[in-house]
Structure formats: C-alpha cells, structure tokens
C-alpha cells in the first residue's frame, strides 16, 4: 500500500473518530483496512462478512461523504471482506443517465438459491420463479405483499439475477419508489423528462420496491401510471412490492389500484419456527460459521417477527463471540441478544382458546380451580400471555380465569417470565403459542 493510500486511510479514520461514538468506531472500523486506492476508487477491507454488511447498511454514505471532503471530489467506494465477498457501495453520479443505472442496486446475495422456502412464502416464491423464467406471460404484474423483513426484496432481486444469468443483455431495473420519485424530480430539474421516460419505459423487467411510499405523490403516481401502461402493453414484466395491499395504500389512484391487482397478489407471512431455523442454518453455511443446534434453536424461538430481525440477532451474536473470544453457546449470547417477546393486538378469548388447544384442555379447565400440574402450568402460561399481549389489568385477567385473585396472576406471570430464560422447551412453547395467536388475531 503506497503512502497516499495510507494517508487517506489515516485521515478517514481520524474524521470518523470525531463523528462516531467510541464503541461504534472500535467495533466497526478498528479492524478494517484499506486494500486499494487508485483511479478514484477506494477499496476498504472488513474483518468479516458481518462487519462488511453492517458497514454497507449503516456507514456507506458517511464514508463516501468524508472521503469526498478529504480529496475534494466524489470517489467510488467498495467494501470487501477477508473471505472475498465484494459489494460495490457508492459510485459518484455526474449525469441523469448515470443516476438511472438499471442494475447496480442488485445485491449479489439476493438470489433464489439463498432463499429459504416455507409454508408462509411458498406461493410468492413459485410466482417469482415463474416470472423470472417467462416474464410478461403469467402474473403480470406480480404484486408481493408482506410486512417488513419477510423476503419481498430478496425475491424481487432474485428475479433480476435469474434473468440476467440467462440473458445478460436484459434490461432489468430494480428501484425503490423513493428512487423512482427522486429520478423524476432530477429529470424535471434538469429538463430531461424524455431521457427519464426512455429509461424506465424500455425496461424488460421493472422491479419496484416499497410501493407504499407512492402514497400522496400525485405526480409520481401519474408518471408511474403511464410507465406501467407502456411496459404492460409491450409485454414487459412488472413486479411490485409493498407492505400492504394495493387497496390499502392511502390516496392511491383507483386506476393504479386496478392495474396493480390485475395480475397476482402474493402474500408473504412471518416464517414458522422450522423455516426460521432453516434460514439461520443456511446463512451460517454461506458465511462458513459453525453454529450449535441449540444456538440456532434459541435464536429461532426468540425472534419470530421477520427474517431481518432474525438475521440481525445472528449477526449480533457472532460479532460478539468474534470480539470476545468466547465459545458460541446459548449462555454466552443470551445476555447480548436479550430478545423481547413481540407484542400483538389480540383478545383474551383467542389466548384462552389457543392455550386450551395446545395443552388439550377445555376452557373450563383453565377457568377452574384444579391444581393438577398440567392444568396449573397451562393456566400460568395463559395468564402470562394475557398480561404480555393485552391491555387487561391484573384483576381483570384474574376474572378471565374464573375469578382468580390478582396476586395469583402476579405469581403466575413472574414464574413463567423467570422460567423461560432457563428452559428452552418453555421458550419454544411460548413461541408456538404466540405464532398461533398472531395467526388467529390477523384473521379476526
């Protein structure tokens, strides 16, 4: 590494020390090195893929801004890990065409081979694969709907990767709704609407993410309507993703609701525990990590909301183990993760019914006074879940369970809360109950 690269790296680190907290700097930058600095391109090497991903998601723009401030002009930034993963992060733009680059947003890790299929995403996966193989035939548009971190973006980009592998010259455009809007604003400002329209309306496959953010943007909706029509009439494939159904997006034009719903709307739900474990196992395999089964079970049981949260927990655990030098055990990672139980909007009737079903008891058993161990245990779990996932007071929960005193409710909640931290079987039971309650509550 020449002296100019060393000097730039030194200056960059000194600036980052001033901008970041000490723990953040030491955790994410202290082990990084500069690998290359030439032809206005800076390549930074992270210690492992987890740090690489964190830098990409959280410090990309900061690095680019600081480097530009140091050298006086925009610089291309690349991140790499010691294992060889490379992600092109930041490329300076000088014209509208460069800002409208069609494929540089695709994450190389978002492909079909790395997507874990389970019962909650099987239809969406099958539809995405069909679209990738024969775009513009069936399911046009394909509308992927689901909560945050459930794999919509992964599937969209997998379509792009698959098509580009078969036909490298395909014009595959992946953009967020925000980027589409920003490109539109730039085109208006630069008086280059013709260039904007030529770009988007000549796509072979248009992948638009986070469509819910089109809400309230009348001019963006107008321009997107005509873009959609042009592509659809030409037999080109459009794939859309949103955290809600078309008709649930506020102030979305009726004509757009109609067009977005004319193909296939594929819903993606939170993964079940078996799928969550498979996701963790596959990620560990790709990252060359050896994870004990009990660690995988612990994370899968305690993180149930979405895949992003699940993988985030794995990253925190492995980063902590890497830094601390401790063995990978549940006991060592539990204090770092400290997973919260996700609160849900539900009713006491649903909780009572789910608990009774799980333990093969009747509602009368739960509300009665039997001290049989299995009934008492189920009753305590029911009280705990009702306390955690409803707004009922302690006396009101006691009434739901046949008029029990509020001190009995307190004892039950405390006992389950303490026991779950040492009992992995109880953790799994609670996770299964919450999944079932979630499912029934969504269908109320």
UniProtKB/Swiss-Prot annotation:
Annotated region (Domain IV, binds dsDNA), positions in chain: 322-444
Location of this chain's protein in the cell: Cytoplasm
Signal sequence residues: none
Keywords: ATP-binding, Cytoplasm, DNA replication, DNA-binding, Lipid-binding, Nucleotide-binding
GO cellular component: cytoplasm; plasma membrane
Domain III, AAA+ region, as annotated region: 105-321
Principal place of residence: cytoplasm
Region (Domain II): 73-104
Pfam families attached to this UniProt entry: Bac_DnaA, Bac_DnaA_C, DnaA_N
Region (Domain I, interacts with DnaA modulators): 1-73
InterPro entries: AAA+_ATPase (IPR003593), Chromosome_initiator_DnaA (IPR001957), Chromosome_initiator_DnaA-like (IPR020591), Chromosome_initiator_DnaA_CS (IPR018312), DnaA_C (IPR013159), DnaA_dom (IPR013317), DnaA_N_dom (IPR024633), DnaA_N_sf (IPR038454)
Residues the entry annotates as binding ATP: 149, 151-153
A GO molecular-function annotation: DNA replication origin binding
GO biological process per UniProt: DNA replication initiation; regulation of DNA replication
Free-text note regarding domains: Domain I is involved in oligomerization and binding regulators, domain II is flexibile and of varying length in different bacteria, domain III forms the AAA+ region, while domain IV binds dsDNA.
Annotated function: Plays an essential role in the initiation and regulation of chromosomal replication. ATP-DnaA binds to the origin of replication (oriC) to initiate formation of the DNA replication initiation complex once per cell cycle. Binds the DnaA box (a 9 base pair repeat at the origin) and separates the double-stranded (ds)DNA. Forms a right-handed helical filament on oriC DNA; dsDNA binds to the exterior of the filament while single-stranded (ss)DNA is stabiized in the filament's interior.
Family that this chain belongs to: Belongs to the DnaA family.
Subunit-structure text: Oligomerizes as a right-handed, spiral filament on DNA at oriC.
Protein name: Chromosomal replication initiator protein DnaA
Organism this protein belongs to: Microcystis aeruginosa (strain NIES-843 / IAM M-2473)
